[in-house]
């Protein structure tokens, strides 16, 4: 990695030139942790916060917000997104992008940031707002605890128990299973489930759940297979007819460096670069393609 002061200088030149794609390119070269160091070096060199300079130089919109997020404290960014999603009518899609698409380490820091910023404990605030009447709410509560426990049986045994839970609509078991099974153990169970039943877990989810319940369990399924798999699915959802810039800002700004494999996982839906080009305008599309490293 070049000296952070040199990278900060490159960014200053790109910002002065109002070159959004170049700012995105520089961001795409580094992890979130490295970008935070670059942002600190920028302040040391120029006496200004990097996101503030981006905001002054660019012309608003989700593009500006995304580029600012990339050089901001990502835990504070996630905390703010969650708070926004809880304000007024709950934004369920935002919960998938921020709560489920998140590593345990990042979640721990997000909880601390939320308390610091809003003087409230995140999980309590979340559950008070959404309630506990629906299964998706209870799964979210389990998910936010990040308490994974090894399953007692073999993958085949666990797959059989899971199938019984689907058949009996034992939602308490399903909530506990998806909320606590370790990711490393999930794939073998999923493979055994399909071999035994001739259908996938995602197909089984669709037999008993609809709407927000369905999407929450579906996202949990992909997250357990790998965050890049979930990112690919969420990006595909965001690539609707008009393109959902708010969702792409959340997904990309917080997780792009951890989910670059999404461009390969996306192949089951089509070509990520092509879909981004089709759904987003000539300002946003090049930024997204650059950050996700797709043509």
UniProtKB/Swiss-Prot annotation:
By its UniProt entry, which SMART domains does this protein fall under? ANX
Gene3D superfamilies named among the record's database cross-references: Annexin (1.10.220.10)
Leader sequence range is none
Spell out the subcellular localization from the entry. Answer: Cytoplasm, Cytoskeleton
Q: Which organism is it from?
A: Giardia intestinalis (Giardia lamblia)
What broad class describes the main subcellular location of this protein? Answer: cytoplasm
GO molecular function terms listed in the Swiss-Prot or TrEMBL record: calcium ion binding; calcium-dependent phospholipid binding; phosphatidylserine binding
The protein depicted here goes by the name Giardin subunit alpha-1
Q: Which superkingdom is the protein from?
A: Eukaryota
Q: What does this protein do?
A: Giardins are involved in parasite attachment to the intestinal mucosa and in the cytoskeletal disassembly and reassembly that marks the transition from infectious trophozoite to transmissible cyst. They may interact with other cytoskeletal proteins such as microtubules in the microribbons or crossbridges, to maintain the integrity of the ventral disk.
Kindly indicate whether the keyword Repeat belongs to this entry. Answer: yes
**Where do the Annexin repeats start and stop?**
2-71, 73-143, 153-223, 226-293
UniProt KW keywords: Annexin, Cytoplasm, Cytoskeleton, Microtubule, Repeat
């Amino acid at each position: 990695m070049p000296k952070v002061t040199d990278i900060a200088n490159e960014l200053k030149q790109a910002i002065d030139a109002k070159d959004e794609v170049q700012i995105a390119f520089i961001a795409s070269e580094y992890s979130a942790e490295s970008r935070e160091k670059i942002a600190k070096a920028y302040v040391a060199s120029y006496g200004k916060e990097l996101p503030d300079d981006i905001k002054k130089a660019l012309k608003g919109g989700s593009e500006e917000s995304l580029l600012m997020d990339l050089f901001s404290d990502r835990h504070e960014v996630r905390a703010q997104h969650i708070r926004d999603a809880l304000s007024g009518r709950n934004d369920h899609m935002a919960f998938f992008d921020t709560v489920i698409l998140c590593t345990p380490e990042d979640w721990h820091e997000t909880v601390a940031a939320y308390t610091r910023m809003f003087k409230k404990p995140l999980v309590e605030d979340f559950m008070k707002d959404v309630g506990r009447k629906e299964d998706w709410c209870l799964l979210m509560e389990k998910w936010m605890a990040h308490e994974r426990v090894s399953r007692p049986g073999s993958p085949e045994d666990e797959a059989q128990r899971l199938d019984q839970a689907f058949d009996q609509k034992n939602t308490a078991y399903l909530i506990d299973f998806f909320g606590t099974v370790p990711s490393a153990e999930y794939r073998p169970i999923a493979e055994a489930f399909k071999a035994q039943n001739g259908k996938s877990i995602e197909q089984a989810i669709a037999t008993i759940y609809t709407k927000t319940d369905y999407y929450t369990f579906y996202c949990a399924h992909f997250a357990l297979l790998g965050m890049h798999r979930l990112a690919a699915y969420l990006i595909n959802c965001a690539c609707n007819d008009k393109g959902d810039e708010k969702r792409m800002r959340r997904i990309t700004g917080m997780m792009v460096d951890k989910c670059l494999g999404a461009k390969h996982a996306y192949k089951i839906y089509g070509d990520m670069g092509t879909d981004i080009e089709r759904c987003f305008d000539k300002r946003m599309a090049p930024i997204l393609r650059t950050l996700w490293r797709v043509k």
